[in-house]
């Protein structure tokens, strides 16, 4: 089965001072986090990668990543642009914040015509997520279902925390058939002195459990889902409460599409430990974690020649 890895790499981390965070070297030979994702995706069966980037990143991105990776896997690019809006809408002059992961993914419409997995550029997901998503899409996806049959990798919350501050996660609830029933964006999740704290979007305390399943934006999708994204974008733009900051977010679109009976999403559990550079101080932990995986033989010392 042809399948594509879509890497959302257009965002610059507002909290991670200095440099584009997804380009920070973490491997023994200067590898970056997404090198390991590409390696794991290819090993699982994905045979193409599409990077979603910004036009101003293109030159550096191709030099640092694309040209090196294209010897190993087919590479293509899509561009997220603030001004890429449906007819009748204009970007407010003062807005500098990208429109969010939903708009980012819309940029691959017409470029990706096969099942795909979408990930964040700056998250390390481990091998299991790619394997279970590829296997589901190749062997279990119901192509005749009235609803689009999609899937996601669900991570265990305790495997996705940062030692250096609070994180935002989509806390997931599955139904009796292991289909995603609800995704709730939850903020400032932090384990401090043995106490797990979190708040909802209004800043009110929210109860979460270390064993909750969370989304790390690793979704197994099909080109038809992009039609749902496209349909929802003008509605989002028309209902914004803050035109400088509101974002069209993938988990929210998926949550709405589930509740509207347009899609079903199989929750595929991954037991791998996530890590990423949410905070500058996380980098050392990531470097040490990658080193440990190389020492264990999970990865070769040098993954791309």
Which residue stretches match the model-derived regions?
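N-terminal glycine-rich phosphate-binding loop and ensuing alpha1 helix
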Residues: 1-66, 73-75, 80
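A short, conserved beta-strand element in the Rossmann-like catalytic core
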Residues: 13, 124-126
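Hydrophobic packing residues within well-ordered alpha-helices of enzyme cores
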Residues: 61-65, 133, 286
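Short phosphate-binding loop-to-helix
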Residues: 69-114
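Short beta-strand-to-loop acidic/aromatic patch adjacent to the donor-nucleotide binding site
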Residues: 114-124
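Conserved core of the sugar-phosphate nucleotidyltransferase
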Residues: 127-219, 223
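A C-terminal functional module that forms or caps the active site or interfaces directly
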Residues: 230-263
